[in-house]
Regions:
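Intrinsically disordered, low-complexity terminal regions
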Residues: 1-248
């Protein structure tokens, strides 16, 4: 732990006032609260080395959280700052103004950002993501995915279960879906869904101002034992594209 800016008196004082305790396997770090209207309590930079799989719970008014390596369950919140993780267990991540990025989350993922980008390479579990202003990118998710976005584009690479997405302004694209239900809604934006080869699709799609492009072709119904995905897509102004997924 050290002052964020060497020689800054407020930062030096903040470092001196920071309390560190360790008891029964629990490490606690508390920095001083902002004092007065200006809230000029100084800033510190803290580096903690933990065993793999450690559980982490942290909050900050202003500050970033960065983690390398594998962690256990994580609960992190910051009013103003980014959250950058490598691999974690179940995660609850929140920032009012900042980006959230993670390589892999094992378990339930709950991610909220007021204004920023969200990018997760892989979620092995279900996920609930809310983004008021910014793009959201999920490469792969194995469980049910729920997305709520006000302004921003949504990209999902591979979805292995249900997907429900609702946005006000922005495009939504799911590159590959194999089974389950897909429910996409946007007020303004294009919707694009790639159906895995060999999967039958039951479509319920509508756009008020735009065009529906269905590249799957007509079918009498799915073959016996075939995977089926039910698609419901609605856009007020934009196109809807239903196509076969590209091989991964």
């Amino acid at each position: 732990m050290h002052p964020r800016t060497e020689g800054d008196e407020a930062d030096l004082q903040a470092a001196r006032d920071t309390k560190v305790t360790f008891s029964r396997g629990r490490l606690t770090i508390r920095t001083p609260k902002a004092a007065g209207r200006r809230g000029d309590s100084g800033s510190v930079a803290i580096e903690v080395r933990l065993p793999n799989g450690s559980r982490v719970n942290g909050s900050a008014a202003t500050g970033d959280f960065t983690a390398d390596g594998s962690l256990g369950e994580c609960t992190l919140a910051t009013m103003d700052g980014d959250i950058r993780l490598d691999r974690t267990g179940p995660a609850r991540l929140r920032t009012e103004r900042g980006d959230v990025t993670a390589k892999r989350i094992d378990g339930m993922a709950e991610i909220v950002t007021g204004s920023g980008q969200v990018r997760v390479d892989e979620i092995d579990g279900a996920a609930e993501i809310k983004n008021s202003n910014g793009n959201t990118w999920i490469d792969q998710v194995t469980g049910a995915l729920h997305l709520k976005v006000a302004n921003g584009n949504i990209f999902v690479g591979q979805a292995h279960a249900d997907v429900a997405s609702k946005s006000a302004n922005g495009d939504t694209r799911i590159e590959q879906v194999t089974r389950g239900r897909v429910d996409l809604q946007t007020r303004t934006g294009d919707l694009e869904i790639g159906i895995n080869l060999g999967t039958a699709a039951l479509l319920d799609v509508n756009c008020q101002a735009g065009t529906v492009h269905n590249a799957l072709g007509a079918s009498d119904g799915p073959d016996k034992g075939a995977q089926t995905v039910r698609v419901r897509a609605r856009t007020g102004a934009g196109d809807i594209v239903i196509r076969r997924a590209q091989p991964v």
